Amino acid sequence: MNRSAALSILKRQSSTAASSSLKRTPLYDLHLKEGATIVPFAGFSMPVQYKGQTISASHKWTREHSGLFDVSHMVQWFVRGENATAYLESITPSSLKELKPFHSTLSAFTNETGGIIDDTIISKQDENTYYIVTNAACSEKDEANLKKHIENWKGVELERVQGRALIAIQGPETASVVQKLIPNVDFSVLKFGQSAYVDFKGVKCLFSRSGYTGEDGFEVSIPEEVSVDFASTLLADTRVRPIGLGARDTLRLEAGMCLYGSDIDDTTSPVEGSLSWIIGKRRRKEGGFVGSSRILKELKDGPSRRRVGFIVEKVPARHGSAVEVDGVEVGQVTSGCPSPTLGKNIAMGYISTGLHQVGTPAHIKVRNKLHPAQVVRMPFVETHYYK
């Protein structure tokens, strides 16, 4: 995958602000030292790839070894208070009461019409404390939504975390790398979706066994004053390479994961977005969350469209490509790329309910030409979460 293709993938998320107004993460100078090509993304100057590494090579390195990703542009929050669980359950469809301490779940903030304001990871630290990570591009509307609804809950406090970087380390050799770096902690007891506070050079860091590549790995919330030291120490291990936004996008697409603003948005419900699994069993019965009327109805009756995967012949499909069956437009591609792992053109998008079954033949229009395609299961590649 070349740089121009990567930039087209990232264009919908990129900031239009002048470079002088773009924010920088604590690792910005390290990116330059490592030979990064910097692009605007969600209001930040971010690395898209690094000198001497094609995006495809970076992708394959992460699948085979360990890749370091700067995700400090994402927003970190704490929600605290005796009504914290009730507050968060009022604005998400997740069953947070049942979530164990230092366990997490993928969730979504929903709006009054059942659409997704943003997708998010919610981690419970105790009955009154939650750590949340949201998308940088949704920062303003997330904050407005969180503050709007918190007024209904006495004693709940919202903190937007400042002064901390967020670093993801992903790939099959990651656990060994991290264990070598911090030998006094047994990371084998930390399973996928779990988190723990870990000391690194005298400071408290939050290690979450999670990520957005389909591989085993960690996301580390770390004070910015030691973040460069932490990242540099990891990169000193020959098994670790810095990986940019280009490969991050192809990795998450192979893993069948959504990119907010492309694959899901304010109009997409969790049900039609094939995210019904984030809706807790108890919540399906009780409802009571914003947008539950539409969402519960779609659970019962089915949505009009569904997010599915496609294999496309000959050329890669891109965001906005029309999906046709028997000459009728029945859907649209939301993400697509050549898969470095499979050597095939993969895509995800929406297709009318009834045509969403695996094996359904279709055609996808790319540059005004129709190309054969087929509905397939996601993820496109096997995932390797540590469970």
Curated annotation (Swiss-Prot):
It is an enzyme of class 2 (transferase). One of its GO terms (cellular component) is glycine cleavage complex. The keyword Methyltransferase does not apply. Keywords: Aminotransferase, Mitochondrion, Transferase, Transit peptide. It is found in: Mitochondrion. GO terms for biological process: glycine decarboxylation via glycine cleavage system. One of its GO terms (molecular function) is transaminase activity. Substrate binds at residues 219, 248, 385. The keyword Transit peptide applies. Its EC number is 2.1.2.10. SUPFAM superfamilies: Aminomethyltransferase beta-barrel domain (SSF101790), Folate-binding domain (SSF103025). InterPro entries: GCS_T, GCST_C, GCV_T_N, GcvT/YgfZ/DmdA, GcvT/YgfZ_C, TrmE/GcvT_dom1. It catalyses: N(6)-[(R)-S(8)-aminomethyldihydrolipoyl]-L-lysyl-[protein] + (6S)-5,6,7,8-tetrahydrofolate = N(6)-[(R)-dihydrolipoyl]-L-lysyl-[protein] + (6R)-5,10-methylene-5,6,7,8-tetrahydrofolate + NH4(+). It comes from the Eukaryota. The glycine cleavage system catalyzes the degradation of glycine. The glycine cleavage system is composed of four proteins: P, T, L and H. Belongs to the GcvT family. This is Probable aminomethyltransferase, mitochondrial. It comes from Schizosaccharomyces pombe (strain 972 / ATCC 24843) (Fission yeast).
